[in-house]
Amino acid sequence: MLFYCVLLYGLCLRFLLFSFRYFMCPRLPSSGNRMIGCLLLLLFYSFWLLRCFFIFFLVSCFIYVVEGGGFIDLPSLRYFTRLFYFV
């Protein structure tokens, strides 16, 4: 599952860089619509990447201390945990 998330992140990042290069191209410096479109696209993708970060890293990768899991050894502590994925 982590592989697919990293793959999706890489594809979206490459598409974002391609879109940034296309919209910031100096062929038409007088085109204000191109700059507005670029800013809207960057705003959309930045919020989308932040959303992906919060969903994956802050929700699905938590280790909860629950009944019925495996042992994780810490210095002087032993937790009985299970790893949950919500995505």
Swiss-Prot record:
GO CC annotation terms, alphabetical: kinetoplast; ribonucleoprotein complex; ribosome
Keywords carried by this UniProt record: Kinetoplast, Mitochondrion, Ribonucleoprotein, Ribosomal protein
InterPro entries: Ribosomal_uS12m
Compartments where located: Mitochondrion matrix, Kinetoplast
Alphabetized Pfam families for the sequence: Ribosomal_S12 (PF17487)
Function: Protein S12 is involved in the translation initiation step.
Similarity comment: Belongs to the universal ribosomal protein uS12 family.
The protein's name in its UniProt record: Small ribosomal subunit protein uS12m
Name of encoding gene: RPS12
